[in-house]
Amino acid sequence: MPKLGMREIRRAQLIDATLRSIDEAGLPGTTLASVAQRANISTGIVSHYFGDKDGLLEATMRHVLRDLWAATTRRRAAASDAPRARLRAVVAANFDDTQISAPVMKTWLAFWSQSMHEPTLRRLQRVNTRRLHSNLCAEFAKTLPRARAREAASGLAALIDGLWLRGALAGKPLDTKAALKLANDYIDQLLAPRV
């Protein structure tokens, strides 16, 4: 009889091994066997929990996305009700420590690439994109006309993705302070009174 709670412990162990495998070997070098080896268990157990490599990547991305959504919720809850503060909180969540480690950044890049080919991953990407846009648009709409709020949300989302992508590809630790300053300056420009 399996131990109570062992399923979640095992899944977390395998997701961590997947993150490490993608970090060290990339997505092409990540196999059920390489994940099993890193987790020190049999390939059959990996297959039992996730089915195949796509299932493993999906579960890993769901984990990373839950961390992102938790960071967003936590940072928004700590911010004042002012739209500027709440927008900055959403931006900061995207550069949270849970999102900028080398294993997570490489997994994001692999996920984005695979989401163009795998319907389940594409759906996860769309949910994430819509959630970000919705969060940004809701805050911008508190001070900007609706059409302008949508444009501002699209622009800030693109800036977040661009800063994050450049940071991920830089080959060195992401300069979160510089990224946050650029994004926050952009927010300030968008919310500045128009003459």
Swiss-Prot record:
An example Pfam family from this entry, by short name, is TetR_N
Q: List the disulfide bonds.
A: none
All copies of the HTH tetR-type domain together span: 8-68
User: Which SUPFAM superfamilies does the UniProt entry name for this protein?
Assistant: Homeodomain-like (SSF46689), Tetracyclin repressor-like, C-terminal domain (SSF48498)
Keywords in UniProt for this one? Answer: DNA-binding, Repressor, Transcription, Transcription regulation
Residues the UniProt record assigns to the DNA-binding region sit at: 31-50
Database matches in PROSITE patterns: HTH_TETR_1, HTH_TETR_2
Name its GO BP terms in alphabetical order: glycine betaine biosynthetic process from choline; negative regulation of DNA-templated transcription
Q: Which pathway is it part of?
A: Amine and polyamine biosynthesis; betaine biosynthesis via choline pathway [regulation]
GO MF, one annotated term: DNA-binding transcription factor activity
- Please give the function described in this protein's UniProt entry: Repressor involved in the biosynthesis of the osmoprotectant glycine betaine. It represses transcription of the choline transporter BetT and the genes of BetAB involved in the synthesis of glycine betaine.
Name this protein carries in UniProt: HTH-type transcriptional regulator BetI
Species annotation: Burkholderia mallei (strain ATCC 23344)
Taxonomic classification: Bacteria, Pseudomonadati, Pseudomonadota, Betaproteobacteria, Burkholderiales
